[in-house]
């Protein structure tokens, strides 16, 4: 067994014996969402890094948790492949894109392409997990047909460290699309949602969409003929490729104009950036300071009061949930729609089975 893994497992066993708590650390690019516990020691995963195996012909790559996400994507790009769910690449406090593969899976965050291609958990084939007892546990594998423990691998995606520290992960990857085109339309929000819902029922290579301030942008991806036919059918303004690429990258990494303004507003006044997960058919929600709509209406970013219970109330009434990403008191994030009692009980039982001693302090989205 790798010496670094042995050392990490021993740290966890010592913490369990001492009834101490550990905070799992990767690139520290999501601390505003995860929150910080001052009395928790750090289990730093960055030393366990590197590509373990890559089979381009099989569309599978296995990497250690501390591997920088930008490094993984560079390796894939050299072979014309990618992570199609557009995982955000956030910067740390020093402005570096230091996010890790383990952090990507633990947070389970996806970007503009999520609605079309699926999320992080849909691409996790297997992983090596260090649980709260200090045991290393293998789940899943490196091929789709090897399904032993497959559901557990998916369960870890988006668990924010509640079930243990991800050590290695095998991911399904896809070839880069042959053609990409961005179209722009001038539309009111209700018209944009209506159009997106209509287009979703048609055989169009619609890969991503976003509406903000009466402008709808869509990304078409696929075969050259399919993209060209869709452009002819839908109309709109064709955005030059280099501008379109920069636009979607900014949206993916949350460094475009909307997110910059939202964070500036949160610093100046008692407002916050919220993420709403809603049924796509939910109508426009008025009365917020600013709104950006993604995923055909399923994900909406809004700027509203930091302690605004109306945000959660409206999300719940629509059959969805709300999470405060930044802003508010302290380190800001984490104010969220409570889980239903039955679902909360399931979450707690799962966590107790993987971490019976409560060694790991999960990110705030999974802190009950």
Language-model features and meaning:
Residues 70-72, 190-195, 225-232, 281-288, ...:
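Short, conserved charged micro-motifs
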Residues 85, 96-205, 209, 216:
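FAD-binding subdomain of flavoenzyme oxidoreductases
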């Amino acid at each position: 067994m790798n010496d670094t893994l042995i050392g990490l497992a021993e740290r966890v066993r010592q913490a369990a014996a001492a009834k101490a708590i550990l905070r799992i650390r990767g690139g520290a690019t999501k601390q505003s969402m995860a929150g910080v516990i001052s009395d928790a020691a750090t289990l730093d995963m960055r030393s366990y890094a590197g590509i373990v195996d890559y089979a381009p012909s099989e569309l599978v790559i296995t990497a250690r948790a501390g591997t920088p996400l930008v490094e993984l994507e560079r390796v894939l790009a050299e072979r014309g492949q990618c992570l199609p769910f557009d995982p955000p690449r956030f910067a740390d406090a020093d402005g570096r894109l230091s996010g890790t593969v383990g952090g990507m899976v633990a947070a389970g965050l996806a970007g503009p392409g999520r609605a079309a291609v699926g999320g992080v958990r849909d691409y996790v084939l297997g992983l090596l997990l260090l649980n709260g007892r200090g045991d290393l546990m293998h789940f899943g594998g490196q091929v789709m047909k090897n399904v032993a423990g497959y559901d557990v691998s998916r369960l870890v995606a988006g668990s924010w460290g509640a079930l243990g520290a991800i050590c290695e992960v095998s991911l399904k990857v896809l070839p880069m699309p042959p053609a990409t085109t961005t179209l722009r339309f001038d539309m009111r929000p209700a018209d944009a949602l209506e159009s997106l819902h209509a287009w979703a029922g048609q055989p169009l290579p619609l890969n991503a969409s976003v509406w903000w301030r009466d402008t709808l942008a869509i990304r078409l991806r696929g075969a050259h003929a399919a993209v060209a036919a869709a452009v002819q059918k839908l109309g709109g303004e064709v955005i030059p490729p280099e501008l379109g690429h920069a636009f979607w990258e900014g949206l993916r990494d949350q460094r475009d104009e909307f997110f910059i303004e939202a964070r500036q507003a949160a610093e100046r006044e008692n407002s916050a950036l919220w993420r709403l997960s809603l049924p796509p058919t939910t109508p426009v929600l008025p009365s917020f300071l600013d709104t950006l709509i993604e995923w055909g209406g399923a994900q909406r970013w809004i700027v509203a009061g930091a302690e605004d219970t109306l945000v959660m109330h409206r999300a719940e009434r629509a059959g969805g949930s709300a999470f405060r990403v930044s802003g508010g008191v302290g380190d800001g994030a984490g104010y969220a729609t409570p889980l239903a009692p039955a679902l909360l009980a399931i979450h707690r039982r799962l966590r107790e089975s993987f971490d019976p001693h409560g060694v790991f302090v999960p990110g705030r989205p999974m802190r009950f």
